[in-house]
Amino acid sequence: MKKAWEAWTNISLVIRILIGLIIGAVLGLVVPQATAIGILGDIFVGALKAIAPLLVFFLVISSLSNATNSHGGVIRTVIILYMFSTFLAAFIAVIASKLFPVEMVLVDAVTDTAAPQGVVEVLKNLPMNVVSNPISSLANANYVGILAWAVLIGLAFKAANDATKKVLNDISMGLSQVVTWIINLAPAGILGLVFTTVSQNGMDIFTSYGKLLLVLVGCMLFIYFVTNPILVFWCIRKNPYPLILKCLKKSAITAFFTRSSAANIPVNMKACEEFGLDKDTYSVTIPLGATINMDGAAITITVMTMATAATLGIGVDIPSAIILSVLAALSACGASGVAGGSLLLIPLACSLFGIPDTTAYQVVAVGFIIGVVQDSVETALNSSSDLLLSAAAEMRQWRLSGKEIKF
């Protein structure tokens, strides 16, 4: 038994995940009634979500309390990349929607959760989350609040003695080890998640909303494989695709199936460590990216709004399209603070064209129907871009300082 386990763990994690994926899909088609299999996925996602807030909190405190150099330049570059790529994603989505207009069959509205009434309300979430109670922030996975308090506490602990700093470092190292153990459970977790998806949804979603999904997923793939490489090349001045593919393998696969940027934070941090990035930097930029780097959300908001306008016969001129891009980018940055995420920001964007809430909520309902694909690809794009842009920004610093870039 021990030899079998060692042989299994010696196989590449990606290969093990693919094996779990295939087994989960087959079981979902053959025995869809065996719902207990899906518990494996729930346990895996729950474990990642549980460890992530603690990992971020102590990693940031430990990094800042022990830091001897300033990393403001790299962090500033990462934030600029996050904001620019989100706007670019919204703008690309507008162009794609104009080139490939989609009309939808609207369904009954989803009205369980109230959508924000304006972009000010959406952006208000960010500063309010900063001053949230730190215990509440940890319990509710409010990463803006966790980051804010961890930064303050970390700076305060810079004056602590070496023994205290060592304890903080030991705690962060211990949590990192727990993350490694959890990530090794990914094959079983992915098996459960894929089983649930296949057994509950089958393949009907692709026939009913195929064209809409093609535009959404096409935009997201374009951002990851065309525009993101341009940003990475600007940073490192060499072929970006080896890094692109490495981030895809390390981050996007798990993010696709967990459908949670928060749950993927430990995965991204582990990848940053393997890339040789500075812990003082990525301990801040990765959780920050899970909050404000929302390329996928910007695409979803834009494409769904443009599809609604096309369905209702509303023309969208160039100035309106640019305004929509800005609005979608700003709204996407606050998506993590809104229940329902990007889908419930669609009514806000629809209001730009005078589309009534009753119709907008029908579009939200369509979003929930296609969510099994849309949300999976969106999360994969968002989370893997956090890793990619964090790595690119630090490697830019390596290039400027004459250090060799390896990945």
What are the language-model segments listed below?
Residues 13, 48-52, 140-144, 179-184, ...:
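Membrane-interfacial loop-to-helix junctions in multi-pass transporters
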